[in-house]
Curated annotation (Swiss-Prot):
Homodimer. GO terms for biological process: L-serine biosynthetic process; serine family amino acid biosynthetic process. Catalyzes the reversible conversion of 3-phosphohydroxypyruvate to phosphoserine and of 3-hydroxy-2-oxo-4-phosphonooxybutanoate to phosphohydroxythreonine. The modification N6-(pyridoxal phosphate)lysine is found at K207. The gene is serC. Its EC number is 2.6.1.52. Its cofactor is pyridoxal 5'-phosphate. This is Probable phosphoserine aminotransferase.
């Protein structure tokens, strides 16, 4: 059945919503009309009923298992995309509003937007701002300028648009007394992480953890007790925690899909095995690009190249060839490789569901395109 489906499914390298594992789609299809024999679709069950209570609790349990999340943390499932938390986090953590300072590490479009949105709720200090360098690299942490009185520090672990991924050691370079907030939207569940190094992690699900419309939050319980009480319910972290994210109707189907994906990751051997595959895919593609005699070029500092989002140009920005590349790739069932409108060029997203074989199909196409367009 899976093989037959793969005959008509394209190689989707889109940045998000990203590719979903075929096994997950088939499981959702199988249960769509009659979830666990209850006579209703998962989309129809009450969020307060026993069926969905089982779904949300199992999803939380499996996420804790995969990331070794201790009982010092709670997991929230919030409606909407991760960018909603660019407002939601300072609303919860800045009790004095715009008088409170928040440190932002600006390494790409999403951390830039977080700092821009943050100014409505706090005083923004840009610890480092890499826009002058066109978001091609990140300066060494020793040069970062933190505020002594900052409420928290915010950074984006993987910049989807610019193809920048921060090193695993980044939290070790942040002041120990600062609350550490990390946007992991586009590399969440792509590798093991030490959750204990963070106070709050958040991620939109539509890359590696599900479908669009839900944001996952991992937050220290001690931090929950410090949140402002006068925050609207939809953003009130403490209220969400106290009600198991069920104080109003959550995106039930989205949580269900996240649950299926977590089971898929567990069946694949967990995050260590997933990381090995992601390293292999990224290495193969970057190595090919770097050895193409500059026909393809990735200008991102090699120390910060994203495993998830590979951005590159053809002949230093030959837009005519890039459009031709996209058009011809589509004929070979290779889709969603156009760069973000703000930067142009090409972008290949190698999320968990993308296989090594699919990556090699892309590289083979790139080789043929190069040979035919020298």
């Amino acid at each position: 059945m899976t093989e037959n489906i793969n005959e008509f499914r394209v190689n989707n390298f889109g940045a998000g919503p990203g590719c979903i594992p075929t096994e997950v789609l088939l499981e959702a299809q199988k249960e769509l009309l009659n979830f666990q024999g209850c006579g209703k679709s998962i989309m129809e069950v009450s969020h307060r009923g026993k069926e969905f209570e089982g779904v949300i609790n199992e999803t939380k349990s499996n996420l804790k298992k995969l990331l070794s999340i201790s009982d010092d943390y709670d997991i929230l499932f919030l409606q909407g995309g991760a960018s909603s938390l660019f407002a939601g986090i300072p609303m919860n953590l800045c009790e004095n509003g715009v008088e409170d300072i928040v440190d932002f590490i600006v390494t790409g479009s999403w951390s830039k937007q977080a700092s821009n949105d943050g100014k409505y709720f706090c005083k923004v200090n840009k610890v480092v701002d890499m826009e002058k360098e066109k978001f091609l690299t990140v300066t060494e942490p020793q040069s970062w300028k933190f505020s002594p009185d900052a409420k928290y520090v915010h950074y984006c672990d993987n910049e989807t648009i610019h193809g920048i991924e921060m090193p695993i050691s980044t939290p070790d370079h942040l002041p120990s007394n600062l609350i550490k907030v990390c946007d992991m939207s586009s590399n969440f569940l792509s590798k093991p992480i030490d959750v204990n190094k963070f106070d709050l992690i958040f991620a939109g699900a539509q890359k590696n953890a599900g479908i669009s419309g839900i944001t996952i939050v991992i937050i220290k319980k001690s931090l929950l007790l410090k949140t402002k009480p006068n925050v609207p319910s939809v953003f009130n972290f403490l209220k969400k925690s106290q009600n198991n994210s069920l104080d109003n109707t959550p995106p039930t189907f989205n949580i269900y899909i996240t649950g299926l994906i977590l089971k898929w990751i567990i069946n694949k051997g967990g995050l260590s095995e997933i990381e090995k595959l992601n390293i292999a895919k990224a290495h193969a593609l970057y190595e090919y690009i770097d050895n193409s005699n500059s026909f393809y070029k990735c200008s991102i500092d090699k120390n910060y190249r994203s495993r998830m989002n590979v951005v590159f140009r053809i002949q230093d920005g030959n837009t005519e060839l890039e459009e031709k590349f996209i058009k011809e790739a589509s004929k070979e069932n290779i889709t969603d490789i156009k760069g973000h409108r703000s930067v142009g060029g090409l972008r290949v997203s190698l999320y968990n569901a993308i296989t090594i074989d699919q990556t090699l199909i892309l590289i083979n196409f790139m080789t043929n395109f190069h040979n035919n367009n020298k």
